[in-house]
Amino acid sequence: MEDFSTRTYGTSGLDNRPLFGETSAKDRIINLVVGSLTSLLILVTLISAFVFPQLPPKPLNIFFAVCISLSSITACILIYWYRQGDLEPKFRNLIYYILFSIIMLCICANLYFHDVGK
């Protein structure tokens, strides 16, 4: 009889991926680093929108802050659903893409707020 440890379940090799709800230590570290970096950059961007270049803030800076906040709320909802197990693991890549887009938006906003390139 075949040994259970050698079954491949239709994949090209041994399949040791975690099941739903299980995450490896590597995945947890990646999630913490990406989440912390994104949260810090969003916080810096929102503060910069209201403080720089002078008080009172420019309306365009407020618009940037609102757009970033709305994008962040969307990402937070997806992360919440993913952690609850309502989304399949393949949606993790979508969450990473959305967070990368938010990071790029924050970088663009900060460059605009601080008049870089003029």
UniProtKB/Swiss-Prot annotation:
Keywords: Acetylation, Membrane, Transmembrane, Transmembrane helix. It is a multi-pass membrane protein. It is found in: Membrane. GO terms for cellular component: membrane. InterPro entries: DUF2678. The chain crosses the membrane at residues 32-52, 62-82, 94-114. Its main location: membrane. Belongs to the TMEM243 family. This is Transmembrane protein 243.
